[in-house]
Amino acid sequence: EESLHHVASSDGRLFLLVSELAGRGTQAFHYAISARIRATPLSFHWNAGKAPHLTVSGQPGSTVTLKLKSLRKNFDETIELTPFGERGDYEVFGPSSIGKEKGNFDFEVQVPETMKPGEWDLLRLRAAFFKEGDNQKEWTDVLDFKAAFQNVFPNIPFPPEELLNRIPIFVMPRKIEVSLDPITGGPGDTVEMKVSLEKKDGAFRFIKPKTSWHGFPKEWKVPVKAQDFDEKKGFAILKFTIPPKTVPGNEIEVFASVRGELENERYMRVFSNRISIGITGKEDALEETE
């Protein structure tokens, strides 16, 4: 008696429930089913990279890079993208349009000078596409955010509703950085790696920060699990032993990250820095002798 609206499953099947009041042998109803294919020519994956916090961030006036990948392989039209948020349109540097047969592009978005450190905005995309001799058409919410989210959190099926098709942009304090002390040691030596968080802006405080180390070869047996960062002391120390078979003279680049929620903010932030570990040993001694 009423028109029914359903979203069909991926295999195209639609199930109809026969009323319990229908008696055997009664006249059957004839269902007219019409299907409309919802085209998604302007849906893009946001490439979040390895960022576990799933945000882009920058200082007021700086630029951030968005990497977008189209869900379509071929384009017969030209597409123009405009990022916007609660503050209106964002200024874009460089080309913001995709020509024919191009589905991937990067473009730089400026963090407004008027935004203050600690503020958030949720970026969306407004897209316009047009063919020769055709009228221009526009869509909004053209991001497909689920892929980026699932790459980082595979055990969580969907992002929070507030983040669907939106990229959180966070305005960074001007001075928060991870500091690492230089490290050298020979094969078999036990060394320490000190990680500290330098904050020049006292208004920001990490809540339950964790420290992680990345880039170490497996044979170095550096713990993969994040460790507590001592807020009172302002640093964390990693102790590890350089494997005896490590070749002297080699240099290994690793990096440390400090992860935590900034006070009064909902989303996780990660700050990181790189450091090189120099392997000393007999080869160095021979060079000095020569």
Label each PLM-derived region with a short phrase.
Residues 83-95, 212-224:
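Short, solvent-exposed loop/linker segments at beta-strand-coil boundaries, enriched for Pro/Gly
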